[in-house]
Amino acid sequence: FIAVGTMAQTVEKNDSVKNAKKTKEYQFTDVKLLKTTPVKNQSSSGTCWSFAGTAFLESELLRQGKPEVDLSEMFIVRHAYIEKAEKYVRMHGTINFGGGGSTLDVLDIIKKYGIVPEEAYKGLNYGLDIHRHGELDAVLEAYVKAVITNKNRKLTPSWKEGYIAILDAYLGKEPETFTYQGKEYTPKTFFDSLGLNLDDYVSITSFTHHPFDQPFAVEVPDNWAWGLSYNMPLEDFSRIMKNSIDKGYTIFWASDVSERGFLYDEGYAIVPDDKVKDMSDSEKARWTKLSEEEKQKESKEKSKKEKLITQEVRQEAFDNYETTDDHGMQIVGTAVDQNGNKYYKVKNSWGTDNEYDGYFYASEPFVLYKTISYVVNKNAIPKDIQKRLNLK
């Protein structure tokens, strides 16, 4: 079953005939699919984290048997921009500033300010019907950089008002009240009406430079708010993900997608095991002369054995900047390829113009290798791990 971008998946299916779809090298069969809302398009904005976060919470509502709701990504983005500016100014410009964010930003913002449906706040106040934040990001960055130069030798109380005025001009003013399906709400009362307990969600990661079974702030630029993730051994890190999907909970996933094995248009992400040392002398000579584009093309021409991912391999990639915090997405199911290799099915926020209508398949090695962190419902975590983490 391959969901199209115009309708929610309202049932789980496991039909190997209906679910099979071919690419040049790979044939995927969905094993388990969870309920999702339609694929959206972040367009030219660095707001994947908000799109993935709202998709995750929308699926949580569907899992609970509640009606489909389209939550506003830009309401969250607006408040994150404000909080990010405050932190940037207080830190004298020594933290990251831009459109990016982390998984935990979505939960933190909604806890503080509530949420609104998409129809109440689209964030498109600049003459376009798609999100295009190049100018907005540049203007906001120039503004906060001007503030921290402190030309008056004392910051005025007006800088924040001016900053918010920019957001009002580009995204629109925040609604104090709005009407949705015949009822009037504020952002906080609308959130209350959804019945979500945001304390149910925790972030998980796996790195060796901090103690296991303890929370720490993952050191990536977009974790500007210093959100905490529980650090798990790789085996448990993987077990939580598998258990989550098996128990019917989707996953809010932050990953590196800069790998050449990430082939979104073709609909899959893998970690080819292209070790030069495993090649013959003639193969080594030929391979080392190939450009990166030629290597990528050759990798696509045949199904390749994937790299064995260990805790050490994962850590090394993070330590040397081969793994970076690129993208937020939603893991919505599991699948296998024609050789029985296991994959996670992923909902993206780049529209529906790829092989699988906005979805793709990420191999287990890719997920273990390239995941920065992920958010899950704590009830999806195996009981023994819940006990170790003292989750209640």
Predicted ranges, named:
Residues 13-25:
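Blade/loop signatures of beta-propeller domains
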Residues 23-252, 354-356:
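Active-site nucleophile-adjacent alpha helix/oxyanion-hole segment immediately C-terminal to the catalytic cysteine
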Residues 4-5, 44, 106, 327:
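Generic detector of short, well-ordered, non-transmembrane alpha-helical segments enriched
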Residues 161-392:
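Active-site signature of cysteine proteases
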Residues 2-4, 63, 69, 130-131, ...:
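Alpha-helix boundary/interfacial micro-motifs
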Residues 1-12:
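Bacterial Sec-dependent N-terminal signal peptides
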